[in-house]
Amino acid sequence: MASSSRFAALLLLALPALALPPSQVVPRAACATPSTVPGYNNDRLPDPFLFDDGTAVTSSADWDCRRSQIAAVVQGYEAGYLPPQPPIVSATFSSSDGTGTLTVTAGLSSDNTISFSEPITYPSGTAPAAGWPLVIAYDVLSIPVPDGIAVMVYNNDDIAQENDLSSRGVGLFYDLYGTDATASAMTAWVWGVSRIIDALETTPAANINTAKIAVTGCSRDGKGALMAGAFEPRVALTIPQESGSGGDTCWRLSKYEQDSGDVVQQATEIVTENVWFSTNFDNYVNNLSVLPYDHHELAAMVAPRPLLSYENTEYEWLSPLSAYGCMSAAHTVYEALGIPDYHGFVQVGNHSHCYFPDTLDDSLYAFFDRFLLDEDDVSTDYFTTNYQFNGTVWNASYWINWTTPQLD
């Protein structure tokens, strides 16, 4: 089955790119945002400081437009269409003994609605005047959270199922938008996070400061958390943990690792495993050079908001060189914006997958303290790796072959 899927993908490469209809490109800025870039071909990491037409990004206002372009092509090639807020969004809230339940109803019409409920665990004590900061954890909380921050465990599988390829089109999102919606499971999860924030903004009883929301998750849920931070601008802090292929690694770099003899997950395999990407991505996994973006630009979409990624070199499958190289490339955007300490990356080994060793607490708590708890005197200058890349050589000047501008 996997071989036939790859053969079909090779045939489909001869077809024109499957662009989203103009009405289905999310409008995010007053600039051209095509969902495909015909004729693009680049074996190295694409320059994030070039617009689709090849002109240079020279200001922070330009970056806003460039971010919108990246959002459009990520949807067009791999993620599928992310719908905007539907016309119906409402919420109810109940609480008891330090916990609460937020029930969100979203719909396209009065006879086409869905509802889902998410639990919130609150800190002890008196809430700040603006409400509690909140961490939204995909599926399960796998990192420590300091005192003074509420936690919601997001049941993202209810929104879009992800058991295997048979999960395509299964979940509440598809009950609303149809089983033929192009959105991948991860895109549907982003939509769910956005509806949760919509609901919290109009539910004062929940007592959440919606300007101080973080998202996190590990492994497949780390991929989802990065997507949420990239596409939902109301997320104040994004913390993907060991997201590996399809997360904070780059497709081109993971292929380079595989070609170097490393046993890593890369694009041709991941599309046969689950429904994290749209079916359209199958058309490109054997010809990655035609992608006018890579995941350094997905991560850079979070900018200028803070991003903290954790990776684990204990697991070759997670593409350790790809993660470091990809986030190094994303880091150039934060440098260009004059906020390099808004982007953290910590890569260590010697621990189990999704286990969070206490040696990482300092970096994590620094980002929480500074960006959710408003402690201004905290340093968030963390960008480190142990360079355990299984003997594969990282050549920064080859892969990151652009000059980082200063964006005023």
From Swiss-Prot:
Family matches, as Gene3D superfamilies: alpha/beta hydrolase (3.40.50.1820)
List the GO terms this entry assigns under cellular component, sorted alphabetically. Answer: extracellular region
| GO MF term (any one) | carboxylic ester hydrolase activity
Which UniProt keywords are present, listed alphabetically?
Disulfide bond, Glycoprotein, Hydrolase, Lignin degradation, Secreted, Serine esterase, Signal
Whether tRNA-binding counts among this entry's keywords is: no
Q: Which residue numbers does the motif GXSYXG catalytic site motif cover?
A: 217-222
Looking up InterPro entries in the UniProt record yields: AB_hydrolase_fold (IPR029058), GCE-like_dom (IPR054579)
What are the positions of the active site?
S219 (nucleophile), H353 (proton donor/acceptor)
Q: Which residues are reported to be glycosylated? A: N287, N350, N390, N395, N401
**E.C. designation(s):** 3.1.1.117
| GO BP term, example | lignin catabolic process
Write down the chemical reaction(s) this protein catalyses.
a 4-O-methyl-alpha-D-glucuronosyl ester derivative + H2O = 4-O-methyl-alpha-D-glucuronate derivative + an alcohol + H(+)
Q: Where is this gene product found?
A: Secreted
**Signal sequence range:** 1-19
Q: Which cysteines are joined by disulfide bonds?
A: C31-C65, C218-C354, C250-C326
Please tell me where substrate binds in this chain: K223, Q265, E273, W317
* Keyword NAD carried by entry: no
SUPFAM superfamilies, sorted: alpha/beta-Hydrolases
Function in brief: Glucuronoyl esterase which may play a significant role in biomass degradation, as it is considered to disconnect hemicellulose from lignin through the hydrolysis of the ester bond between 4-O-methyl-D-glucuronic acid residues of glucuronoxylans and aromatic alcohols of lignin. Can hydrolyze benzyl glucuronic acid (BnGlcA), allyl glucuronic acid (allylGlcA) and to a lower degree methyl glucuronic acid (MeGlcA) in vitro.
Into which family does the record put it? Belongs to the carbohydrate esterase 15 (CE15) family.
User: What is this protein's record name?
Assistant: 4-O-methyl-glucuronoyl methylesterase 1
Q: Which organism does this sequence originate in?
A: Wolfiporia cocos (strain MD-104)
